[in-house]
């Protein structure tokens, strides 16, 4: 499946932000420090475990950027606290364009969960690299034949569900689902979607809740069975048809499609010439046939946005999640304490007085 997203009124009302496909002309400056950049390898610190969606797409996209940048990009994983550890590490590095962050959903979870005080749309220049789908999977011999069976089981006991971290994207989706269905799950957090899938395969939990891209190799091999995807219509991938969650919980329709974004972030204080060079390489990387194949193989889709769109999307995503987490009782910090409006008031609020675009 291919999908390209853009922020519009329909998705705003669904509390789901996205990015369009606009681009800005960018030219590399020939004078000053940026003219010699990059003069050494760039380090990409990925905030989730090896093998998960953030890892796969960030590594793949970084490889596609090496040619346009004429640089070597060295990727390493620093999982924990839904990328807060990697975020803190990169923010403490010099803002010289040599330290990048690989994360998901523009770090929208960190402030509402009290993991980090940094403001995503003030600290980072974001470069979205992929969009992903949410799904639930079980071992082939699981007694849960459909998602209806899971819901029925929760009437007797909380079903154990793995996800990529407390306060992360899949935890958010599970919270929305649980509240709409009036059930409770017993959540077991892991440091990424890949470990969350392995937990189900090894019998540590009953259901894996994560991205379809993190399940796909096991679905292909028949080692995992999909129960549903967070969509409003059936989804077909390589001849496999996945049922929409609305078939079992119609109340979540306003939140569909519920999905995640994978992004690379660069310190916003980096020289503008360097940020422009990175953005130019970003646009070129999306033309890579190799990266297109990575998207296809891992059930991802393109999410291209220009710098101004990315700033707005990062703020909107944080605003929506802070509101949802408060409603679900997950938030550690109230949205009002973060200076965030209610989602329905976002368009009037944006841009706030202290917002300063870095690239225009």
Predicted regions and their residues:
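Secondary-structure end/capping motifs
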Residues: 265-330
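Hinge/capping helix and adjacent helix->loop/strand transition within the periplasmic-binding protein
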Residues: 65, 89-98, 111-195, 261-294
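N-terminal (or domain-start) structured segment
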Residues: 33-122, 170, 183-209, 218, ...
């Amino acid at each position: 499946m291919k999908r390209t997203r853009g922020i519009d009124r329909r998705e705003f009302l669904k509390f789901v932000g996205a990015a369009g496909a606009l681009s800005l002309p960018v030219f590399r400056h020939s004078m000053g420090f940026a003219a010699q950049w990059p003069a050494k390898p760039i380090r990409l610190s990925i905030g989730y475990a090896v093998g998960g969606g953030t890892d796969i797409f960030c590594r793949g996209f970084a490889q596609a950027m090496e040619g346009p940048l004429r640089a070597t990009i060295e990727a390493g994983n620093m999982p924990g606290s839904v990328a807060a550890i990697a975020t803190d590490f990169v923010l403490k590095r010099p803002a010289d364009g040599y330290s990048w962050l690989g994360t998901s959903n523009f770090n929208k979870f960190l402030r509402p969960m009290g993991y980090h005080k940094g403001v995503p749309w003030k600290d980072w220049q974001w470069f979205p690299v992929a969009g992903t789908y949410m799904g639930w999977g079980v071992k082939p011999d699981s007694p849960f034949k459909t998602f209806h069976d899971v819901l029925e089981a929760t009437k007797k006991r909380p079903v154990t569900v793995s996800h990529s971290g407390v306060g992360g994207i899949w935890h958010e989706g599970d919270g929305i689902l649980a509240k709409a269905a009036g059930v409770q799950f017993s959540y077991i957090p892991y440091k990424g979607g890949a470990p969350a899938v392995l937990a189900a395969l090894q019998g540590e939990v009953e259901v894996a809740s994560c991205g379809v891209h993190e399940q796909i190799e096991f679905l292909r091999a028949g080692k995992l069975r999909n129960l549903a995807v967070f969509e409003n219509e059936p989804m077909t991938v390589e001849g496999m048809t996945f049922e929409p969650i609305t078939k079992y919980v119609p109340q979540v329709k306003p939140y569909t499609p519920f999905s995640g974004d994978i992004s690379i972030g660069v310190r916003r204080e980096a020289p503008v010439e360097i940020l422009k060079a990175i953005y130019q390489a970003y646009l070129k990387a999306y033309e890579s046939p190799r990266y297109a194949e990575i998207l296809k193989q891992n059930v991802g889709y393109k999410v291209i946005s220009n710098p101004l769109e990315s700033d707005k999307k990062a703020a909107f995503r944080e605003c929506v999640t802070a509101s949802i987490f408060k409603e679900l009782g997950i938030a550690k910090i109230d949205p009002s304490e973060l200076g965030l409006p209610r989602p329905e008031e976002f368009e009037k609020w944006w841009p706030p007085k202290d917002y300063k675009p870095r690239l225009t």
